Amino acid sequence: VEMAAQAAEARGLKSALISVGGNLRAIGTKPDGSQWSGGVENPWNASDVYTASSSYVSGVNMSDMALVTSGNYQRYYVVDGVRYHHLIDPDTLWPARYFDSVSVLSPDSGAADCLTTGLFCMSLEDGQKLIESLDGVEALWCTTDGQLVTSSGWSSHEKK
């Protein structure tokens, strides 16, 4: 996604919103000058992967920014009543169990994609420390017990 955005910008594109799976990348602002909008799907009320959902836990305004989400609610399979998703904890070699989804806002879609996967596999405390150490990067965690936790600057991007 980031490479597509960079190629488009190199060819003079000033305004676009690229959407690929759970990755959004805004180039500039809308033609009218307003910011692009993105949403973080509610993982506790997510519809089937093939059906559009209108339930969001957060909406954000973006320009020259990426919004990427990783979650356990769309890519999974069930064996003997147990759901296994695709985000594997490198310490246990089993699906990570800290969160239902993690979203990252970053100027770089590739970095945001890496961060969502990494944050999904680490404790909230460690993830918060990491995000707060990065300039221009914010995160939203949807915990397995139904809480929303955000980094210190997430609210400055939220739609009012």
Stretches with model-predicted labels:
Residues V1-K160:
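Mature catalytic core of soluble alpha/beta enzymes
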